[in-house]
A protein has these predicted regions:
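Conserved GNAT-fold acetyl-CoA-binding loop/helix
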Residues: 23-45, 56, 89-91
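A short helix-loop-beta-strand connector motif used in the catalytic cores of GNAT acetyltransferases and
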Residues: 45-59, 76-81, 109
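Conserved beta-strand in the GNAT
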Residues: 59, 65-74, 109, 114
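Conserved acyl-donor/pantetheine-binding loop and adjacent beta-alpha core of acyl/acetyltransferases
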Residues: 74-112
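Conserved GNAT acetyl-CoA-binding A-motif
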Residues: 106-108, 129, 135-147
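Conserved beta-strand-loop-alpha-helix junction that forms the acyl-donor binding cleft
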Residues: 111-120, 143-153, 168-174, 179-180
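Conserved acetyl-CoA-binding loop-helix of GNAT-fold acetyltransferases
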Residues: 115-117, 121-134, 154-158
Length: 180
């Protein structure tokens, strides 16, 4: 079953989010500490009005276990959503940081799509994408895919996403794919 996340999903969703964006989280908190990175994501997940909030998250649940998650939001809201993250980093870790904008007005942006390693390849990622496409029927959906993740890129292409351009994020190049 696919449903909107709740704050109580944080312990299950944060590790999935980290799996999809570990290098970016390490840069944000300026530590290569897996447990601290997951704590960082959990704290943001339970809050409202930020990129990583439960408000922006769909979960795939089976037998009361969360097996996948998809975080998305309207690209027009990237500035206030990311500012909340940067403010949290300043308050929690004491440093200022800014990353390149990963999206913009005119698209709904998939920030992370992640499936538990034990059930990858079983259609969960595809199900989450299909659900989002149905929710956002008629809207443009964008995402960034790492140059080192051809498996994910193939999934997105099978789901109808096409290459739009290249973007930099946290100092690394990503392919910007869109679905219209």
């Amino acid at each position: 079953m696919i449903r909107t996340a709740t704050p109580s999903d944080a312990p299950f969703v944060a590790p999935l989010m980290f799996q999809a964006m570990s290098e970016i989280v390490f840069k944000l908190i300026q530590q290569e500490d897996i447990q601290e990175s997951i704590r960082f994501l959990e704290k943001l997940f339970i809050q409202e009005n930020n990129q990583y909030s439960y408000e922006n998250t769909l979960v795939y649940e089976k037998d009361k276990q969360i097996l996948g998650s998809l975080v998305y939001y309207n690209g027009a809201h990237i500035d206030p959503l990311s500012q909340s993250v940067f403010d949290f980093i300043k308050a929690s870790y004491g440093h200022d940081i800014r990353l390149e904008k990963e999206t913009q007005a005119g698209e709904y942006y998939i920030d992370t799509l992640s499936v538990s390693p034990k059930v990858q390849g079983k259609g969960i990622g595809s199900s989450l994408l299909l659900h989002l496409k149905e929710l956002l029927k008629g809207e443009t959906i964008g995402l960034l895919v790492s140059m080192d993740n051809p498996q994910a890129e193939k999934l997105y292409q099978r789901m109808g996403f096409v290459y739009a351009d290249m973007k930099m994020l946290a100092g690394a190049p990503y392919k910007h794919l869109i679905y219209q």
